[in-house]
């Protein structure tokens, strides 16, 4: 009698302990591993740095899909595309966005160039060389590569005439390259998207509220708001759903623009686009997030839940999206029919 072993879906990350935004990847890996086991997969967590040995050992087990949570190696975000490139060379399916999309979104200024060329509204910006904005324009100084609000606090909102000085100070303090974009005073929304059997599904957009913020405190999602659980910002920036009912026109605009970003960057698997909305109700795309945080209590997971997608269903859908990128004939020949089996698991997961 032949006993079929479970399909192997390892989880790969390169996070290091020490920073809350790094610990986020470790928490995601733990939650996803537990969920994959409950869905019937074999899974473990593979931590990597610049040594390829763990990846080589993982490949010996012939993974069905690699669940990619790598957003950098040894805290160097420039190495985020390393694992996708390695897996693409070996023709191994992996979750989330592909190598080329990750590279395109790694630099915020490069992302803004792409969005501007595609006709997607994004705030004007200043780099470290030129300053085309009037000096009294409010701008937000932020990292070109960090996607966790690293280096952003209340003092990041300044006049354009002060931007170059603040950019140089931030670069000296945090390293890397900083720039400044026009600060859109108004509301903030996150729009999450996940691949489905017939294409991308744009999930309900939550608004980030700035509850009880004093007039002199910039209404921004800074580092404290994301990671410092005891801070005023963290405790006073809840998310609120329902924009599709309270302002259907704005809800449609946000979803349409998010889908345009998905197509422009060639996003796959799952992604998130952050928006500011000005006083006239115009959305501005400010950040493109490939493979955003998907811990069980993360904003992305809460958004999926609002759309009726449970956490196990979300994880299964991300796995299935990776499989769909592989030629069906090749999958059938090598693996049988994991796509159909996955559809059954998704149905079962709804009751879990």
What residues fall within each predicted segment?
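Conserved N-proximal alpha/beta basic substrate-recognition cap immediately N-terminal to
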Residues: 17, 21-22, 26-124
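Active-site nucleotide/adenylate-binding loops and adjacent lid/helix of ATP-dependent enzymes
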Residues: 1-14, 58-63, 102-188, 196-198
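ATP-dependent carboxylate activation and anion-phosphoryl transfer catalytic cores
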Residues: 244-352
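Phosphate-binding site of ATP-dependent enzymes
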Residues: 160-256, 284
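A short glycine-rich, hydrophobically flanked beta-strand micro-motif that places a catalytic Asp/Glu
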Residues: 48, 178-182, 189-190, 266-280
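Short glycine-rich anion-binding loops that position phosphate/pyrophosphate groups of nucleotides
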Residues: 15-17, 71-73, 144-146, 291
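Conserved beta-strand edge residues that scaffold enzyme active sites
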Residues: 50, 72, 101, 128-129, ...
């Amino acid at each position: 009698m032949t006993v079929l072993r479970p399909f192997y879906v390892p989880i790969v990350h390169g996070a290091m302990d020490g920073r809350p935004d790094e610990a986020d990847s470790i928490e995601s890996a733990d939650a996803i591993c537990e969920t994959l086991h409950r869905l019937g997969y074999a899974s473990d967590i593979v931590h990597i740095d610049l040594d390829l040995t763990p990846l080589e050992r993982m490949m010996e087990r012939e993974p069905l899909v690699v669940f990619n949570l790598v957003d950098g190696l040894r805290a160097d975000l420039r190495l985020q595309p390393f694992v996708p490139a390695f897996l693409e060379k070996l023709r191994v399916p992996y979750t989330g966005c592909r190598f080329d999309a990750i590279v395109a979104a790694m630099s915020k200024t490069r992302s803004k160039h792409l969005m501007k060329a595609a006709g997607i509204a994004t705030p004007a910006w200043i780099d470290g060389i030129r300053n085309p904005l009037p000096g009294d324009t409010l701008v937000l100084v932020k990292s070109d590569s960090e996607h966790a609000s690293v280096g952003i606090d209340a003092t990041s909102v300044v006049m354009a005439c002060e931007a170059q000085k603040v950019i140089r100070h931030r670069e000296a303090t945090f390293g890397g390259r900083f720039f400044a974009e026009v600060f859109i005073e108004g509301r903030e929304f996150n729009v999450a998207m996940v691949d489905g059997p017939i294409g991308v599904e744009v999930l309900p957009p939550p608004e980030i509220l700035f509850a009880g913020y004093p007039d002199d405190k910039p209404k921004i999602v800074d580092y404290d708001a994301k990671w410092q659980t005891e801070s005023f910002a963290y405790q006073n920036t809840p998310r609120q759903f329902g924009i599709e009912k309270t302002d259907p026109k704005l809800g449609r605009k946000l979803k349409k623009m998010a889908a345009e970003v998905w197509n422009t960057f060639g996003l796959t698997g799952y992604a998130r686009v952050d928006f500011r909305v000005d006083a006239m109700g115009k959305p501005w795309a400010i950040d493109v997030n490939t493979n955003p945080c998907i811990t069980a209590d993360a904003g992305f997971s809460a958004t999926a839940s609002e759309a009726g997608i449970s956490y196990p269903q979300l994880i299964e859908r991300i796995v299935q999206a990776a499989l769909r990128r592989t030629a069906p004939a090749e999958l059938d020949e090598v693996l049988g029919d994991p796509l159909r089996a996955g559809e059954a698991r998704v149905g079962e997961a709804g009751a879990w």
